[in-house]
Amino acid sequence: WRDWMIGYESSHIEYVDPDGEIERGPLENSYQQQYQKRYYAKIKDWERGIERELEDLTTVMLTFSASNKNDLGGWRCPADHMRDIADGYQTAYSTLWNVLDGYEWDFAKVWEPHQSGYGHMHLAVAVEDPAGSISAEMFRPVMRSYVENTKPAGSEAHGLTTPGMGDAVSVNDDVGDLGCYIAEYVGMFGEEALERSISTQLFYATCWATGTRRVEFSGRAQDRIAREQFRRETGLRPEDRGGSTFDQWRGDESGGESGESGESGDESGSWAVDSICTVSGGSPTYSDPTAGGQRLTRIDGREGVDPPAHRD
């Protein structure tokens, strides 16, 4: 991971602009400070969006974790530990849909590093709750589903032995400092990634090796973020002019990022990725942008080498 990060210091990406000219800029990744600032802007846009659009807002924070020891008493492989949590979350998410059936809600999923170097997951949920009926106990089936389908996840750590769900589920009747909490979880403020503690870098390396995004927004949350960005950039409301201006703006934004052509079917007005290069001493060395990526492979027999510990 460190070698990969260091490689970004001299890496650039080249685009073909709408006039056919080559434009070059630094290649970025989500662990760099400038990228973190965009993450934070999105988080704050989501916070503003739910506060603006949900009149009777309730926020819920659910925390999913797992033991970092294996069944042999040793340390669990960090990648397997992260996958344990991610796989268990998928079953919990299905239960969450049932629990919140009939409500308008959206969420942000966030991974936070622990001082041990392992990670755990927070799910920040924003719910329109006009009757004030949302309580922590409503989410007991969600946490039970997670524990039952995640062998190294304990009942006590997920509030199942505690009335009110303990620290595993927290409910607030406003947005509060939700954006700041999420930013703190992700570690958006502070030192550059390669200057952080070894435990934090271990967590980053695990996210990188498993292809895990540290922050993800639901589709509805992404829509709110886009509307807030539109307000900020244009000074208009998304519903102005029947929403057509917002739709056009969003289409232009999407096309500009992806390099897709517009409605006319030609390439005019679009940007396209041309190549990736390393610049050293002023002379670029080019690479095929389609040749990279991660290749994930299961190791035969790994269950016997690193079996997850069972927690009641």
Model-flagged regions — what are they?
Residues 124-128:
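Short hydrophobic/aromatic beta-strand micro-patches
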Residues 1-117, 129-312:
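Right-hand nucleic-acid polymerase module
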